[in-house]
Amino acid sequence: MSSGSRPSSGGGGGGGGASGGAGGGAPGGGGGGIRGFFSKLRKPSDQPNGNQVQVGTRTFEAHELQKLIPQLEEAISRKDAQLRQQQTIVEGHIKRISELEGEVTTLQRECDKLRSVLEQKAQSAASPGGQPPSPSPRTDQLGNDLQQKAVLPADGVQRAKKIAVSAEPTNFENKPATLQHYNKTVGAKQMIRDAVQKNDFLKQLAKEQIIELVNCMYEMRARAGQWVIQEGEPGDRLFVVAEGELQVSREGALLGKMRAGTVMGELAILYNCTRTASVQALTDVQLWVLDRSVFQMITQRLGMERHSQLMNFLTKVSIFQNLSEDRISKMADVMDQDYYDGGHYIIRQGEKGDAFFVINSGQVKVTQQIEGETEPREIRVLNQGDFFGERALLGEEVRTANIIAQAPGVEVLTLDRESFGKLIGDLESLKKDYGDKERLAQVVREPPSPVKIVDDFREEFAQVTLKNVKRLATLGVGGFGRVELVCVNGDKAKTFALKALKKKHIVDTRQQEHIFAERNIMMETSTDWIVKLYKTFRDQKFVYMLLEVCLGGELWTTLRDRGHFDDYTARFYVACVLEGLEYLHRKNIVYRDLKPENCLLANTGYLKLVDFGFAKKLASGRKTWTFCGTPEYVSPEIILNKGHDQAADYWALGIYICELMLGRPPFQASDPMKTYTLILKGVDALEIPNRRIGKTATALVKKLCRDNPGERLGSGSGGVNDIRKHRWFMGFDWEGLRSRTLKPPILPKVSNPADVTNFDNYPPDNDVPPDEFSGWDEGF
């Protein structure tokens, strides 16, 4: 083909440049590759010859360029082949990466299972309170400067099981609290106060509590070289360094030094724990010391006195006369404390009002502007315990008098109409049903200790003894003992879970009362949302509980293996828990240990609550004070020992929602004390990632995790129904859940009554605990 035969495609008007632009390769001169070459083609504006094409600074004849087309097409073909080859290689690498990621995930799950087993096994040698071994260099909260930030797995998933902790139950409610004060110089008191105010946890205490804490600390001195704290020993004292220098070490490795003004050991005043580091005096040192029992007495006494005082004030208000003690108690919880200087108008006549006030200390003057008089007339003076503004809670908003604070000032407790409405509902409609007061009083009159056999199915186990029970496999281990899969009288077609608790461990941790409470509460319950207790046994080494078995395994294990749950899955498991909590709360029982580890999956895929070691039955309107629970789940009022009730379970429910959707609890750090500090900062300080948990679920969490227990969703007049009505549950089939017709999101694979594949594998237990003969378990 001649050059003249292709004028339209190769020559005329620079068309060759346009055609060649589809190809590649540079014939020298222009450089920059095929596209670079053709991008430079242009018709010279000063050349009359239309068959010439300029490339950069060079000019070519069109027929010369046409000769290059076959070469360019061949080059393009070679490049295409190379690209296809490279693409095949890349696709192979991508496939291999995907396979390796799957293998890594599988290995990670196996590592998680082994880690869970090892950590639970290690609990046997852990602290009396059941705290896990220290995961990273820290000093058992021996000094704030040595505390570290949370260290989470890269994917944000918490892979280790969470360990519950507990102090010994206190009985300060039933006996007067006698506190001994120790003399100190003004400088010593100021030094202790300054140290307390610098401590993230202790500075959260009320002013009165800090004053009492300072007064009750006693002096201790140690010489250079003396051990103040030794790793592994039980701890029950807090220290403030007054003079000298100490060093902190773990397993012989130096962690740091502490000097005057440092607080150490604050975790030990909350609950039973062993020291995870040693502290040795480098010089002669002076310390101020506070015992755990004294700290608990200080915090509990103030909380009890304040709550009792408020209850006394509120029961005297005429419009509250017919409210139950439980509702008045909730009102006391949500009242705010305010202070007004002398001369300040707390209320002005004629203005709209929506708050009720109780005078906590000081005086107020009541004046009223009478028509025809130039000056307001003084009506009366109100003192401590008096109240005013109660009609505003009924909607009568216009104030009819002035209320003026008297010098030097007045402290008042306030309740606004909105909070009152949420707690009580419409007062007029409430007056139509005062039966709750009588019903609740009946609950209080019931003796708390006798066990009720509520179901006929327990009768068939009346003659069963420990000799009739055969162990088949291990379902779980911990510092308390083990849980075994068992059958009775050799019948493997019907299996059970046998929980064996070490009596010596129970006595060492002073948990006898909790163990009996667990037995009594579980014997009184009969619902599909709670694991059934059939029978209890005891011998010289253990107390035993024969329980309903749930072979679907722990919800925590499923969560660990999946990483996190979507909205639909989480909603189902939250709804199951809510049904169980409602049942318990109707019986005035607070659960206090909600977490995925204590939620078991039945063969049907439905969830049941287990482990009632921290559950407690309360009298109506009353609180309990023992520090117990799982660090990541405890509420602020438990940490600060303000007294707690069922509202603590609503806080835990919010944390539970977060963990199911995020794969880890929202409050989490490298040590419990740091975790408690995060909790006390509040849920509003959290940055909850929205890629896994949406705005609606986040809103529910924040309503459940209010700092004030009385403000939490579920604590109001609507109770649990207020939670069910939240937008996150919109469209949820509650009737289907209760009738068990709603399909569960996950159906466990269980092949037979002895199938334990949904549980981790545990090694045999060769540790034989010593005998325990104190007799505390008589009647168990």
From Swiss-Prot:
Residues 469-729 form the Protein kinase domain. PROSITE patterns: AGC_KINASE_CTER, CNMP_BINDING_1, CNMP_BINDING_2, CNMP_BINDING_3, PROTEIN_KINASE_ATP, PROTEIN_KINASE_DOM, PROTEIN_KINASE_ST. Residues 46-55 have a biased composition (Polar residues). Its EC number is 2.7.11.12. When phosphorylated, interacts with saeg-2. May interact with saeg-1. One of its GO terms (molecular function) is cGMP binding. This is cGMP-dependent protein kinase egl-4. Changing residue 362 to R: Loss of body size, reduced locomotion in the presence of food, a pale intestine, increased intestinal fat storage, and a decreased propensity to form dauer larvae. 3',5'-cyclic GMP 2 binds at residues 380, 389-392, 399-400, 434. It comes from Caenorhabditis elegans. ATP binds at residues 475-483, 499. Expressed in AWC sensory neurons (at protein level). Mainly expressed in head neurons, hypodermis, intestine and body wall muscles. L2 and L3 larvae show extensive expression, lower levels are observed in L4 larvae, later embryos and adults. Isoform c is expressed in a subset of neurons in the head, nerve ring, and ventral nerve cord including some motor neurons, also in several neurons in the tail, the pharyngeal marginal cells, body muscle, intestine, vulval muscles, and spermatheca. InterPro entries: AGC-kinase_C, cGMP_dep_kinase, cNMP-bd_CS, cNMP-bd_dom, cNMP-bd_dom_sf, Kinase-like_dom_sf, Prot_kinase_dom, Protein_kinase_ATP_BS. Promotes chemoreceptor gene expression in response to increased cGMP levels by antagonizing the gene repression functions of the class II HDAC hda-4 and the mef-2 transcription factor. Regulates gene expression via recruitment of a histone deacetylase complex containing hda-2, saeg-1 and saeg-2. Represses body size and lifespan through the dbl-1 and insulin pathways, respectively. May also signal through daf-3 and/or daf-5. Role in egg-laying, dauer formation and motility. Regulates behavioral responses to various chemosensory stimuli in sensory neurons. It is an enzyme of class 2 (transferase). Binding of cGMP results in enzyme activation. 3',5'-cyclic GMP 1 binds at residues 265-268, 275-276. One of its GO terms (biological process) is sensory perception of bitter taste. GO terms for cellular component: cytoplasm; cytosol; nucleus.
